[in-house]
Amino acid sequence: MNAELQALKERRSVRKYKADMVPQEMIDQVIDAGLYAASGHGEQDSIIVAVTNKEVRDKLSKMNRAIMGTKSDTFYGAPVVLIVLAPKSNKNAIYDASLIMGNLMQAAHAVGLGSCRINRAKEEFASEEGKQLLKEWGIEGEYEGVGHCILGYADGTVPQAAPRKANRVFYVK
């Protein structure tokens, strides 16, 4: 099997991270790969907000926990949160942003980082508190949260892939 296909199969979601900050160069490499995701008609209008500020990261975690209804850190201790947002004006942008999320996670794996997709970005950034954060960050326009890609160094062994479920592919010949 070629290396690219093998990498797709080996990437796992990491749910326990070391506190060590990821070097900016690695974060930039992951983001750059995310920006190369396909987008309908080449629009390239979904955006990424890279959060490395611990205070802001912790605030986002608190918001996310409240939506989920849990007291535990929904970012699993990861020091970096990449928020992917799609413009509400583009009906296909959510799909484009989802491709960005996939590229971010694969790129993290490629550079030796752990990652995990975290949901509830839609609810976070639909809230008044979330809208205020976007405004504070200088992000103008109407955006919908698509997901958080958390990044960091895995703390412990990365889990093996679960067996793939059967009957998920249908061929029409």
Protein language model annotation of sequence segments:
Residues M1-K173:
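Acidic, surface-exposed loops and disordered segments
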